[in-house]
């Protein structure tokens, strides 16, 4: 279900403050965040944001094509290694 157009996109306040602070200084430092639910907005373009995937922070460079998506979409939390080759023990 999509978000209502009457509401603004969700961006965590601490993340928005950090981005605005870096934009006023015209710096491009790494921003570390746990907020995977935040929506990417146009002021984030050009920044590198390290998004937590449950184990570590993955640095993601924000481009204009990412605007409107959530930060968590670009940091996968699961890595599927494939099914077991010989699974005879569990077949019984």
From Swiss-Prot:
Family matches, as SUPFAM superfamilies: Ribosomal protein S19
Gene Ontology terms: biological process: ribosomal small subunit assembly; translation
Coarse class of the protein's main subcellular location: plastid
Keyword 4Fe-4S: no
Molecular function terms, GO-annotated: rRNA binding; structural constituent of ribosome
Keyword set, alphabetical order: Chloroplast, Plastid, Ribonucleoprotein, Ribosomal protein, RNA-binding, rRNA-binding
Domain of life (superkingdom): Eukaryota
Pfam families according to UniProt: Ribosomal_S19 (PF00203)
RNA-binding among keywords: yes
Gene3D superfamilies linked to this entry: 30s Ribosomal Protein S19, Chain A (3.30.860.10)
Signal peptide region: none
One annotated Gene Ontology cellular component of this protein: chloroplast
Subcellular location: Plastid, Chloroplast
Family, per entry: Belongs to the universal ribosomal protein uS19 family.
Known function: Protein S19 forms a complex with S13 that binds strongly to the 16S ribosomal RNA.
Name used for this protein in its record: Small ribosomal subunit protein uS19c
Originating species: Populus trichocarpa
């Amino acid at each position: 279900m999509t978000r209502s157009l009457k509401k603004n996109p969700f961006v965590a306040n601490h993340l928005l403050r950090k981005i605005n602070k870096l934009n006023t200084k015209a710096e491009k430092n790494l921003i570390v965040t746990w907020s995977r639910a935040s929506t990417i907005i146009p002021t984030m373009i050009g920044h590198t944001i390290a998004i937590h995937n449950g184990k570590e922070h993955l640095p993601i460079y924000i481009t204009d094509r990412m605007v409107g998506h959530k930060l968590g979409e670009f940091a996968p939390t699961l890595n599927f290694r494939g099914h077991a080759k010989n699974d005879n023990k569990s077949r019984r």
